[in-house]
Amino acid sequence: MTASVDTKTVEGQINDLKIDSTESSTTIPNNGKQESDNEDDEVDESSTTQLSSTGDKKKKKKKNNKKKKKKIVSIDSSYPDGVFPEGQWMEYPLEINSYRTTSEEKRYLDRQENNKWEDFRKGAEIHRRVRHKAQSSIKPGMSMIEIADLIEDSVRNYAAADHTLKAGIGFPTGLSLNHVAAHYTPNTGDKLVLNKDDIMKVDIGVHVNGRICDSAFTMTFNEEGKYDKIMEAVREATYTGIKEAGIDVRLNDIGEAIQEVMESYEMEENGKILPIKCIKNLNGHNIGDYVIHSGKTVPIVANGDMTKMEEGETFAIETFGSTGNGYVLPEGECSHYAMNTGVEHLKAPSERSKQLLQNIKDNFGTLPWCRRYLERAGEEKYLFALNQLVRHGIVEEYPPIVDKRGSYTAQYEHTILLHPHKKEVVTKGDDY
């Protein structure tokens, strides 16, 4: 999902992370199995008149001039051997890890986890294709419901799983606008529409066998480049966090490096200079099987946390920048939920909430979900029972989190795998 929330409160390899379309190993088409760039390609088959070889006019057969939609097919059909594109490889930053690159023992250990890595790579390839479709299709005037359906239906079609727990959506699609930093997805009946001057964070989760790829980007439609600087600040801060991350690296050191880059930027609006701040109570996080926030948090400011990253862990490195207070609070109608872990001893307080809980377990397990997904799973008139589960600590709610009104926020995020010998930015693409 998006960042964990803490309510208590370069050249070099950074350049390597920037996309060179001639060198990227994770561009959307792979192994010559490219799909159309636009699954909604328009086919122009209107009637035309041509001359025959004798000069007589011949009328071409008139065909139906309708837009034809190309059906999205399972990602497996493009990779029948089950081997998916690798992400971007990077060496670990600390001197003590230099031996890992050439260690045969470390490479052997890495091969033992190959099924795990392939699950992540499959999810990442789905993610790249889905966001490619989103980036080419989303336009001002679309409703949030339309945008969410576009993204989520694409994930489901590419995953082509016979059960939500085998593969598919990793968490509700985040579509947070302007001062809303994270955890907004539309509930049924939401009338919110994307406007030309909005800045939208698009946070997409894809899982395969519970291995979650968590990656986010920011979209704008302002033709004057109003948001260019805040987007650049957050993108570069995320790249810095990825560069600094690695085995035995202290979490505080990553946050300190991110903050230095992020807060060196500012943007201008109507002649006024707006400093760009890290949203200090939002963090990256490690990812477990079927668990999006698995214990460790990766700060985006210096916070004194001396905890180290460890071999074999998976992290979502994400940063948020804001022109506001640089601090978020919950506000608005909740849409995001997840079952709490370690609460198996707690019992649902009513027969209806017991039925709802069983449906949640069957369809989502410990993966996050939203109200629209419950309705897709057949639930009706469930809000009272859902609120009971929340009050009893069985289900956790994640309402939208916002900075002050009138401010702007941006987000970029990638999932990284800490292999024994190198780190892999598995969700890297030719877009960001």
UniProtKB/Swiss-Prot annotation:
Cofactor(s) the protein requires to work: Co(2+); Zn(2+); Mn(2+); Fe(2+)
GO BP field: protein maturation; proteolysis
Stretches with biased composition (Polar residues): 1-12, 22-33
Location in the cell: Cytoplasm
UniProt protein name: Methionine aminopeptidase 2
Main location: cytoplasm
Cofactor note: Binds 2 divalent metal cations per subunit. Has a high-affinity and a low affinity metal-binding site. The true nature of the physiological cofactor is under debate. The enzyme is active with cobalt, zinc, manganese or divalent iron ions. Most likely, methionine aminopeptidases function as mononuclear Fe(2+)-metalloproteases under physiological conditions, and the catalytically relevant metal-binding site has been assigned to the histidine-containing high-affinity site.
Top-level taxon in the UniProt lineage: Eukaryota
One Gene Ontology MF term: metal ion binding
Family stated for the protein in its record: Belongs to the peptidase M24A family. Methionine aminopeptidase eukaryotic type 2 subfamily.
Gene of this entry: MAP2
E.C. number: 3.4.11.18
CDD domains the UniProt entry points to: MetAP2
Entry keyword Transmembrane helix: no
Binding site residues for a divalent metal cation 1: D203, D214, E413
NCBIfam families: met_pdase_II
Catalytic activity annotation: Release of N-terminal amino acids, preferentially methionine, from peptides and arylamides
Matching PROSITE patterns: MAP_2
Lineage: Eukaryota, Fungi, Dikarya, Ascomycota, Saccharomycotina
Top class in the EC scheme: hydrolase
